[in-house]
Amino acid sequence: MGREAEHFSAGNKRIIIPYHGWNICLLVCYDLRFPVWSRNVKNEYDLLIYVANWPIPRHLAWDALLRARALENQCYVCGVNRTGMDGYHLKYNGGSKIYSAFGEEIASLPDEQEGIATTSLQLGALNRLREKFPVWKDADEFHL
């Protein structure tokens, strides 16, 4: 779709990085469309970060899928998207956002604006949600 195959090859394992008590899962662009790839089995990670190039025609899917990944994986989700025009004349409006595990948008940048959005993520609040509503215990395990 975005000609990723010309520059990237499919991975065979997820990258989860421990950082100051957090486990962070790093994914790219098109991975957002595949929920099994981001499945948070046994709460392996707390923060899911997507770095992406989603053009304006797909901005509704971008927003909906980021929120869905936060809800289904009981984690924070940060989606970082580009702005401007690419060499194929596709226009990008940004739409970078951070969602809580409740699916609430907790930080964002206005469309068409480059910049940095900041917020405080609370690991304790995330762990309390997971203890109170442990849906991950009932989830099917998928192996890729």
Predicted regions and their residues:
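Active-site catalytic loop in hydrolytic enzyme cores
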Residues: 1-43, 57-64, 128-135
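C-terminal/domain-edge helix-coil "capping" segments
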Residues: 133-144
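CN hydrolase (nitrilase-like) catalytic-core segments centered on the catalytic cysteine
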Residues: 33-116
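Glycine-rich, small/acidic residue-mixed loop/short-helix segments
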Residues: 119
